[in-house]
Design a protein with these regions (language model features):
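N-terminal anchoring/stem segment of glycosyltransferases
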Residues: 1-47
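Short acidic, S/G/P-rich loop/turn micro-motifs used as interaction or catalytic elements
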Residues: 9-13, 60-63, 88-90, 106-109
Length: 229
């Protein structure tokens, strides 16, 4: 029904996950190596010919029972749809890293000044209560740190529209404390704590918060923290 796009940027498990997706859905497309999350999604939208398109992140390990047969009615063609994902470090299950179904036209002209990509596309947002994948970001030190940093910067700064404050506090606490015994769990927690601090400090500074979408800046920040510690 809708185009499927796999978006990758230097993830160590990207090729493996891409090959698995391609084996199940041969018509899937790939956007690889585009700097900036928003720019990558804009390029993805420009490659699509359907009114909506699916986005699968490079670190997503799709569940066997998930398929791409969801159909959007005409009243929701401008709505961002997000499925749930399981976090392999702290076991949280919510929209972080989940498969997304995006409106093509609106994605092409999204507001790139906003730090949170999904809420910069449309004011209409729908959570689908189904787990689509495991977000296997904990494959190396940097990607684990980066994932914790980015998500906790967004949570702590309250930039995500319609955030539930109690839920946000619980998620922040889990990101910052749980998973020490999991692969690269310590790096994830270190990134989460640094991201929380960064988000709280810059909650009223959208320009500074937008840096969380710049992977080169994140890599520099990661190395700087490694040197400090």
């Amino acid at each position: 029904m809708y185009d499927i796009v796999f978006i990758s940027y230097k993830e160590s498990n990207a090729d493996r996950n891409w090959n698995l997706l391609k084996s199940r859905y041969p018509s899937a497309k790939r956007i690889n190596g585009v700097k900036g999350i928003q720019q990558a999604h804009i390029k993805a939208a420009k490659k699509c010919f359907t009114k909506m398109f699916w986005v699968v992140d490079a670190d997503a390990e799709l569940l066997d029972n998930f398929n791409f047969n969801y159909e959007v009615d005409e009243y929701n063609l401008e709505t961002v749809h997000v499925w749930r994902s399981q976090n392999p470090v702290n076991d949280l299950v919510y929209g972080y890293g989940g498969v997304k179904l995006l409106p093509t036209r609106l994605t092409k002209k999204m507001d790139t000044s906003k730090p949170d990509m999904t809420t910069s596309i449309s004011s209409n947002f729908k959570v689908i209560n189904q787990v689509s994948n495991i977000t296997a970001f904990n494959t190396d030190s940097f990607n684990s740190w980066k994932s914790g940093f980015r998500e906790c910067a967004k949570l702590a700064s309250r930039i995500i529209d319609r955030q539930n404050n109690t839920e946000t506090i619980e998620r922040l606490d889990t990101w910052c404390n749980k998973g020490t015994n999991r692969p690269f769990g310590l790096e994830c927690i270190a990134g989460a704590k640094a991201g929380k601090k960064f988000g709280e400090k810059n909650k009223n500074n959208p320009k500074e918060l937008a840096k969380i979408n710049d992977f080169d800046w994140l890599l520099e920040s990661f190395y700087a923290e490694c040197k400090r510690n």
